[in-house]
């Protein structure tokens, strides 16, 4: 921790306060913490999530954690729908055993599934879904399909359950109940390459543009590297088909010019895959995104489409997720930023602090700004909140504590902006606003200027 005197120019008599803050370079204890420990530390400080032994391996997202979780999903839905042509579906959490037998999961993945038995006379066995692909196959096969519908892209954000061993559970990185930005593409052989390249483009947007993770390797231009995972010992389907699928992925990798290495025997039981790997601050690697090429499930579900020559042909299925587990992605973000969220993702976007909590003019000016930025309606107002409007996470600290204490508290919580209101601000009708990462520079802005500034930050993912 550092302690320094900060002069807040917020009244005619300048106010001096001690400011306590974490330096950007972590302390020795923080820098040696595992991602799970770092996640727990930040969560406690920012009230992000909790766990309970009554539901091991499941996460309770508290309001601040839910804001981050939902914002990540909102971001991904926008990219998938309006940039890459996905249509979102919502599918059941539980299916009969017969579905999992058909897909091959019951034979190859049963140990990792939660099984449920009904209490009726039939005592039929069900399974909680560990992945969405069989459900998406049911949607594709529900009606006749034509070649001009392809590529057909489904996305799904519903929760998944996997029966991880209790000893393997670890914070947000290894859970029994989690969410993925899951998606499946049904396409023709001639469309496979362009669809996989588009999946890699979205991965580049996420890992090289929006979220600056630790570099994926020594001197790497990309923040990630790719593991090319090939046929495992236990697999379904024909060996010749597997060899063809692996050759297709290898050619795409070589053409992409991206860093990759062979990971023999670690493919999915239904097809080879490209696993996107990032490193945490301890240089340990974690799988996040994945792209999988599958010739097997379309065969097992007898999926087909009518081609231009009126013959029926089998589509190829591409499984892909960009965040991978959203919970794990959040853990790696925390490991990378230590709770210093970018403004658009921050549950603590701004805090408004009056110098004198007894001063009516200062309080009025503070509450007016908070109401404007939060953009909330009163409960007795019969008008609904408009869709697609801006709402910022802005708090007002009017605790009966010295202003220096409240400033220190805001800094420790990593608010993106501190907005101070004193006598001078009341006189000028401008707010004293300071960025989290710039402790020496202040701006005097009007309410409308702050509103426009925050909109620009969110629009540009800053």
Swiss-Prot record:
Enzyme class comes to ligase
Q: Which UniProt keywords apply?
A: Aminoacyl-tRNA synthetase, ATP-binding, Ligase, Mitochondrion, Nucleotide-binding, Protein biosynthesis, Transit peptide
Question: Which residues form the organelle targeting sequence per the record?
Answer: 1-45
Reaction(s) this enzyme catalyzes, per UniProt: tRNA(Thr) + L-threonine + ATP = L-threonyl-tRNA(Thr) + AMP + diphosphate + H(+)
Compartmental location: Mitochondrion matrix
Q: Does the keyword Transit peptide apply?
A: yes
Family annotation (SUPFAM superfamilies): Class II aaRS ABD-related, Class II aaRS and biotin synthetases
**What is one Gene Ontology biological process annotated in the Swiss-Prot or TrEMBL record?**
mitochondrial threonyl-tRNA aminoacylation
- Nucleotidyltransferase in keyword set: no
- Output one GO MF annotation: ATP binding
* Primary location: mitochondrion
The entry's cellular-component GO terms read: mitochondrial matrix; mitochondrion
State the InterPro entries in the record. aa-tRNA-synt_IIb (IPR002314), aa-tRNA-synth_II (IPR006195), aa-tRNA-synth_II/BPL/LPL (IPR045864), Anticodon-bd (IPR004154), Anticodon-bd_dom_sf (IPR036621), Thr-tRNA-ligase_IIa (IPR002320), ThrRS_anticodon (IPR047246), ThrRS_core (IPR033728)
What are its E.C. numbers?
6.1.1.3
Gene3D superfamilies in alphabetical order: Anticodon-binding domain, Bira Bifunctional Protein, Domain 2
Q: Which CDD domains match?
A: ThrRS_anticodon, ThrRS_core
The record, for Pfam families, names: HGTP_anticodon, tRNA-synt_2b
Q: What else is known?
A: Present with 1240 molecules/cell in log phase SD medium.
NCBIfam families annotated for this entry? thrS
Describe the family membership recorded for this protein in Swiss-Prot or TrEMBL: Belongs to the class-II aminoacyl-tRNA synthetase family.
PANTHER family per UniProt: THREONINE--TRNA LIGASE, MITOCHONDRIAL (PTHR11451:SF50), THREONINE-TRNA LIGASE (PTHR11451)
- Protein name (database record): Threonine--tRNA ligase, mitochondrial
